[in-house]
Amino acid sequence: MCDFSEEQTAEFKEAFQLFDRTGDGKILYSQCGDVMRALGQNPTNAEVMKVLGNPKSDEMNLKTLKFEQFLPMMQTIAKNKDQGCFEDYVEGLRVFDKEGNGTVMGAEIRHVLVTLGEKMTEEEVEQLVAGHEDSNGCINYEELVRMVLSG
């Protein structure tokens, strides 16, 4: 069925179960990408939607999937090697480093994360940057990327 070891499959199942809020062995479609990201993958929202069969937005919080359905989706995402690395993300943020000192304004990074590319909600951004701003409102983007990639 898949190329994962028994140990990996057990780890995936454990993470899957942490997202199973009702204990019925299922997660919502809307949680699929979160489980994958918790397991070290970095799929775009578009990639997650594709492996889910491109459901309508109102189905995301209604439809569910079992672990047996999730595993082949995880395999598809894991095979995608174009997920970016530390240097890619740092380079992307360096564009906003006007002073060339390894920091970006917190307000600017918030704006970028809610408006460009894989848009995040304001709540997600606040959760992400919490505790990373210095007294001048700047964020060390290398530290931020390191924290995000470490899970």
From Swiss-Prot:
Gene3D superfamilies reported in the protein's UniProt record: EF-hand
GO biological process: actomyosin structure organization; myofibril assembly
GO MF annotations in UniProt: ADP binding; calcium ion binding; magnesium ion binding; microfilament motor activity; myosin heavy chain binding; myosin II binding; structural constituent of muscle
Keywords: Acetylation, Motor protein, Muscle protein, Myosin, Repeat
Top-level taxon: Eukaryota
Residues recorded as bearing N-acetylcysteine in the entry: 2
Quaternary context: Myosin is a hexamer of 2 heavy chains and 4 light chains.
EF-hand domain span: 7-42, 84-119, 119-151
Protein name: Myosin light polypeptide 6
Any Gene Ontology CC annotation: cytosol
UniProt function note: Regulatory light chain of myosin. Does not bind calcium.
